Amino acid sequence: MGQKVHPYGFRLGYTKPWKSRWFIERDYDKLLLEDVKLKAELKEKLKSAGVSSIEVERPGNKLRIIIRTARPGIIIGRKGAEIDKLKGELQKRTNREVYIDIQEVHKPELDAQLVAESIALQLEKRVGFRRAMRKSVDSALRFGCKGIKVRVSGRLNGNEIARSEWYLQGRLPLHTLRADIDYGFAEARTTYGVIGVKAWVYKGEILPAAKKREPQVATAGNF
């Protein structure tokens, strides 16, 4: 039976960057655990802001957090009150100078994580899974994606036996490294149990920049 590699990890260092960027010689495990907890807590706290991803950088003794979100106004707050409050809480907890960068996701319909969370939210509101899947796929295609696949797994419609169903439109070249494929996962907590939602969005190919030709230096042998 064929196994699937994680689309982001497969392209890591080739077309996708690391989501935690820092180096330390000692106590690596402590900083890694701090990163994991920090991302999980921020994701839960900013649930209503439509957070796509959280990246962490640690230049020196500072902490820089990059949050990609569909609704930046919720995080920033009126006159920056909410973001200042969040920054203060993080500084007190980590004992570091904290910088928070907010990056807006202009097309949430093409962000795989937000697509998966949108479907999960609809399932929690008792919307039919086929209707929720088709609606998200149609929206993504309308906004210009080259291909999209959505998969839901669990006790669909409250059935006794768990199963998986998926819906695919367009192209999805998972084994092409230069393909810009975004991947997202979310969970819908329904009265029948947890339903897992996965989304793959293909946005096109990332082509390397054309190399500039270096001018040839004339030597005695060229004359």
UniProtKB/Swiss-Prot annotation:
GO biological process, one term: translation
A Pfam family reported for this protein in Swiss-Prot or TrEMBL: KH_2
Keywords: Ribonucleoprotein, Ribosomal protein, RNA-binding, rRNA-binding
CDD domains: KH-II_30S_S3
Gene3D superfamilies: 3.30.300.20, Ribosomal protein S3, C-terminal domain
SUPFAM superfamilies given in the database record: Prokaryotic type KH domain (KH-domain type II), Ribosomal protein S3 C-terminal domain
GO molecular-function terms, A-Z: mRNA binding; rRNA binding; structural constituent of ribosome
Domain of life assignment: Bacteria
SMART domains with a match to the protein in the record: KH
Residue ranges occupied by any KH type-2 domain in the UniProt entry: 38-106
Record-level GO cellular component terms: cytosolic small ribosomal subunit
Family statement drawn from the similarity comment of this UniProt entry: Belongs to the universal ribosomal protein uS3 family.
PANTHER family assigned to the protein according to its UniProt record, in alphabetical order: 30S/40S RIBOSOMAL PROTEIN S3, SMALL RIBOSOMAL SUBUNIT PROTEIN US3C
Function summary: Binds the lower part of the 30S subunit head. Binds mRNA in the 70S ribosome, positioning it for translation.
Subunit record text: Part of the 30S ribosomal subunit. Forms a tight complex with proteins S10 and S14.
Identification of the protein by name: Small ribosomal subunit protein uS3
